[in-house]
């Protein structure tokens, strides 16, 4: 994901392209004769506009979210305090710390205790199809993020900056499942020694 300075530069560059693409789309809608031309104008305008608005959004959000990183550090410390004597260190790493998750968190934090439509979150990712999955991954870490659907519209709300440490065993279990460093039997033994159910 681009940094804040490059996002501002990209926004000014892409804004003109988006204006042109939307103009072509409006023209195709007004003078609709060939369905294929209309569809092509729409898909192009959608792609260019998504990239332009992503740049504008990332220029608006902080380039580095210290609270996001502090919460990750809290989760990491809690994992280590519980399991460092029984679980290998490479399974005690906090996932989902990349720029995409950080950007989504920044937008949700900006609207703390307020509903945010999934469509707004998709601006952060350039309308990526996996945006809502990335948001739900924040919930897997124990972030106080709630989801509901209203009139078939997905709504997300970060209700506080508290963490639910009860989800830490599931983080370790998921890390073990994804790891290629251990056999299936080794993973079972690691989880058993840590007192973490294999299924959950």
Annotate each predicted stretch with a short phrase.
Residues 162-188:
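Short, amphipathic alpha-helical interaction segments positioned at domain boundaries
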Residues 150-160:
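Minor-groove-contacting beta-hairpin "wing" of winged helix-turn-helix DNA-binding domains
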Residues 1-76, 84, 191-200:
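Long, compositionally biased intrinsically disordered regions
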């Amino acid at each position: 994901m681009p940094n804040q300075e490059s996002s501002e530069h990209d926004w000014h560059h892409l804004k003109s392209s988006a204006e042109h693409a939307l103009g072509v789309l409006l023209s195709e809608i007004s003078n609709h004769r060939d369905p294929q031309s209309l569809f092509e104008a729409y898909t192009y305008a959608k792609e260019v506009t998504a990239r332009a608005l992503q740049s504008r959004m990332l220029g608006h959000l902080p380039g580095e979210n210290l609270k996001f990183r502090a919460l990750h550090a809290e989760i990491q410390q809690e994992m280590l305090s519980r399991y460092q004597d029984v679980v290998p260190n490479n399974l005690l790493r906090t996932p989902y710390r990349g720029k995409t998750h950080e950007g989504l968190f920044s937008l949700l934090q900006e609207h703390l205790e307020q509903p945010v439509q999934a469509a707004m979150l998709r601006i952060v990712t350039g309308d990526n199809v996996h945006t809502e999955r990335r948001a739900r991954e924040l919930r897997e870490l124990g972030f106080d993020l709630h989801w509901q659907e209203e009139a078939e519209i997905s709504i997300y709300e970060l209700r506080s900056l508290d963490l639910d440490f009860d989800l830490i065993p599931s983080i370790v279990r998921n890390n073990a499942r994804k790891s290629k460093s251990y056999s299936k039997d080794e993973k079972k033994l690691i989880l058993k020694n840590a007192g973490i159910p294999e299924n959950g």
